[in-house]
Amino acid sequence: MKRSVNAWAVGADYGFEETFAKVKAAGFEAIELNLDADGAHALTMETTAADLQKIVEISKKFELPVSGISTSIGGNIGSADEAERQAAVDVVKKQLFLAKHLGASAILAVPGAGNTPWGEAHEICIEAYRSLTPVIEDTGILVGMEHVWNGFFLSPRDLAYTVDEIGSDFVGVYFDIANCADRSKSEDWITFLGERIKRVHIKNFNRKSVFEFAFPLLFEEGTIDWVPVMAALRKIGYEGPLTAEFGAPEGDPSENLIKSADAIRRIQCL
């Protein structure tokens, strides 16, 4: 399992070259980039193949591969509104384009429902991804659907059902260790989802009470028990990157990056 980090940890004031340099110097082995709004190191819907070639050269310079393409504009692929749904499909297609040109092997997808009822939205999402399957499989890029706090995936069973109904080896789960830790054990989700898990976001969580929680950095105090989490990942045969995901601080992000990379090293040894 390689140490990776999402570029959001660096901050939009830094260009791609500075971002790659800081991530490499901190001890990470890969970086996850983002399809996002405009920013110094954001990929956008307007990013071209020529733009991506420049990033490829930076990646080679620092010997830091791109592990995946995340996004903050995932859209509502489960929406009954055709225009809203098509916008979400376009995001997935753009992520696949970006990943292919950057040599990344996976993208992160965040299905949403908009104002569509939950059950109907899941079936619409499944049909949308079935339609996308030929495009996905043609690129050879893995698509991992992530459970975020938008009310779409409420349990590992919801994720498993959706992935299984889509029925492609290239569509699975992008598992976020912290996003399910408010009410359940991350290791239970890992065990249930098994080989459906294609990629992992490694994030900390601190559940102080039923109504009080926080997302501390990996090197800060949290309530996730990393021993069973790592045991569960090994049991299902996961060998992909562990991608840290956290926001950039004010000022230089180097200290947080270094401490986070060190924290992943310690977690890897558990």
Specify the residue positions occupied by each region the protein language model found.
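Glycine/Thr-rich phosphate-binding loops of Rossmann-like dinucleotide-binding domains
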Residues: 41, 117, 210, 252
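Active-site acidic/histidine proton-transfer and metal-coordination neighborhood
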Residues: 17-18, 53, 57-65, 75-172, ...
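Hydrophobic faces of well-ordered beta-strands that scaffold small-molecule active sites
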Residues: 3-7, 31-33, 66-71, 107-109, ...
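Long hydrophobic alpha-helical segments typical of transmembrane helices together
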Residues: 229, 238-253, 257
